[in-house]
Curated annotation (Swiss-Prot):
Pfam families: Jacalin. PROSITE patterns: JACALIN_LECTIN. This is Jacalin-related lectin 8. The keyword Ligase does not apply.
Amino acid sequence: MFIIYLFIFLSSAIIDSNGVAMAQKIEAIGGKGGKRWDDGANDNVAKVYIRGDHEGIQYIKFDYVKDGQSFNGSVHGVSADGFTQTFEIDHLQYEQIVSVEGYYDWKTGVMQALQFKTNLKTSEFIGYQKGTKFSLGVDGKVIVGFHGSAWRSLRSLGAYVKTAPTKSELQGGITGGEYWDDGPNFDGVRKVYVTFTETHIRSMNIDYDQDGQVVTRYHGMKNGETQEFAVDFPNEYMTSVEGTYDHISEGNYLVLTSLTFKTSKGRISQTFGLVIGTKFVLETKGNVISGFHGRDGGSFDAIGVYFSPMISS
């Protein structure tokens, strides 16, 4: 039995106008012939549908998530007598496909079996494990779309991959308040609104960009002075958050006392709050901020971020 590992054959990266990495294309592997199809790069894969029989996989179909909306992809191949199996990915819990393993018959050119692995679970092999084995994926990246070839059966399969967002640890009071998580699936940060008093940060609202639309998330209690900082998205990205945290006399809680934001153009926001206590910096070279998470109760207790890669032009 031949085994092929496809973890390195990548075409050039797909990037946006600011050099933020969108996706890379892994070349398709499998049999020859058939009509080429290409679902393109999306935000996530939501569900996999496979129809097959003893001769191999007849067709494959994917449901995707793009710009926060789920949609049904096209059927690649044809349907005949046989079995149908599905595999669901819980994208709302940030589950993502990280690799695909499979088998194809090099004589007939027909895909025989596929298995999908996510960051949370692994499917069973769908189909029959015979022929040439292959693996499709890139370490440290997630699959956000597929392409390949098909005729009366699935012939080959390739993928679009992107670097998985990195989630930072929380800074501040990590036990107080309730935990919240906006997730990493935004295009960028447009504006932040920070409410603070003489002693600590009370709340932070964030305007995210998602496919050109503003999506706002609210965290904390808006009691105090509110100031804002705007990012010139999509010409500019937020890249760094600096701040301090300390115990306050009201219950001796550990909370955030100040916040400052930096952008890809080197701009620095005003300092929100009072710089006192332990200092922290949330920044990773070559990355931009694509989402926030944190804790809040009566005060804004803690903050963390999601980083997505930027490719220098």
